[in-house]
Amino acid sequence: MKIIIQNQQDKYQIDESISKIIEDSVLNTLKIFMDDENYEISVMIVDNQFIKELNKHYRSIDKETDVLSFPIFEFKNGELQEDIAIVEEEIPLGDIVISIEKAYEQAKEFGHSVEREIAYLTVHSVLHLLGFDHIEEEDRMLMRKYEEMVLEGMGLTR
């Protein structure tokens, strides 16, 4: 498993503990759905302004958001929906963008730790890479089930 974490902001310190939370969140989410560890995910840590620009560019929504996910393959609820030819050691699953600034704001708003919020946002994003969505209520509840399962397994309950 290759997890590439890039810090593209300077408002908050990204130390080893934050990187470990992100890595553990990715690994614990993927192990529910994947049989092996030959995958790669890129995680970019940004501020609100940067994610707002990405949100406007890619989704035509001119406001900040907490996370964006850019999957490479088509999944539906954790199952690959297309055949892929493996040509690299690690199969890239996609890119995740997390606004660390928004994570701090939401942790304060929801009354839990920043660590829990970062873990939640990471798990949420990985699930999006795996084809989960929360537009329909049934899909939202399924996604929420997996989010809580991973967070509880990491000891990060509300």
Curated annotation (Swiss-Prot):
Single strand-specific metallo-endoribonuclease involved in late-stage 70S ribosome quality control and in maturation of the 3' terminus of the 16S rRNA. GO terms for biological process: rRNA processing. GO terms for cellular component: cytoplasm. It is found in: Cytoplasm. Binds 1 zinc ion. This is Endoribonuclease YbeY. Keywords: Cytoplasm, Endonuclease, Hydrolase, Metal-binding, Nuclease, Ribosome biogenesis, rRNA processing, Zinc. Pfam families: YbeY. Zn(2+) binds at H124, H128, H134.
